[in-house]
């Protein structure tokens, strides 16, 4: 999902335009942005922080060891929905299928095998493809 209406042709206007989260806030919605990624000083961070509630769950552990699956975001969604706001807009920033693919889904979601963790080397191409395909299946299930 795009966070603003900026295109490649007018990218510099990103500094002057409001994002979609702000648009929903101005329309009277309670807004939330939940991310399964770390802060990286990007526009995702910039627009996400416009929300009433903003949580980057990988930052919660502090030491970098926390590697939650995207399902962990659903706990935050449930808590936010329990607030019973009459109008809510929730954005989920998932980890999806970023490398290392095998870390993007629980072991019980491994359908294509072998998928054991490997380095990104040509000799492991089949394992990498299997792990990537499993991550796509898991994301599809998540959505």
What annotation goes with each model-predicted range?
Residues 74-79, 115-143:
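A long, amphipathic alpha-helix that forms part
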Residues 1-117:
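Active-site-proximal alpha/beta segments of enzymes that process anionic O-linked groups
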